[in-house]
């Protein structure tokens, strides 16, 4: 016997929730299951998903998860309680990420050639002042404080505590070699002004955090940092995933690097 599907979950107050900074937080299928004949997939996925769904409904107040963009068949969830007007149905919402196919870039110079002009301009100018930065070791408190400075309006006092735990957990994954962190300080002030954090899977590198202070952001440090990541992982992974592009400003920013849209689904019950 072999495990064909596993499903990580986080439970808070008997509710299935998606942790901050995580995408595609849902079922993972083995290669054996995914490579089976098409005529078998619907039956297999139906049987497996049904067992999970029945367990979740019985044990949790709410169900909330996301499917990876390679799993676009959501019929099993759409058919749950099909035709029963008095029964609860799954809510299925389309979401998008932005990805860059690193294997299509035969040489590194092809990476920046797909950037929007303003990004290329920012990077060119930022290189002239990048000597004012110095690499540094990561520090959880400093990273948390810098992130909160840019996103404080999103988090209540209670949520800020959870946020710090979430950032600590992601850093813990990096320290277990599931990712990498890059941090830079201003040489004059010796303060952290920029960091990025990526996590790895077998084929992809995921941009989980990309953060700078407001003054350095205006100078183009974010574009400089992303360009550095794309060059570093060119030839090492198939895909660079920006992990979500679901608001007008962030979507436009991520696609300005030549990323293509990837549809995935968020499903609730």
Report the location of each language-model feature.
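Conserved GNAT acetyl-CoA-binding A-motif
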Residues: 58-69, 233-243
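Conserved acetyl-CoA-binding loop-helix of GNAT-fold acetyltransferases
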Residues: 38-54, 217-231
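Long, mid-chain structured domain cores
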Residues: 45-57, 61-64, 71
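Alpha-helix C-terminal capping segments
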Residues: 55-59, 126, 133, 174, ...
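A conserved beta-strand-loop-helix scaffold within acyl/acetyltransferase catalytic domains
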Residues: 1-15, 69-217
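Aromatic (often tryptophan-rich) hydrophobic motifs at membrane interfaces
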Residues: 172, 176-269
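Conserved acyl-donor/pantetheine-binding loop and adjacent beta-alpha core of acyl/acetyltransferases
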Residues: 11-26
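A short, internal acetyl-CoA/4′-phosphopantetheine-binding micro-motif in the GNAT/acyltransferase core
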Residues: 23-40, 209-218
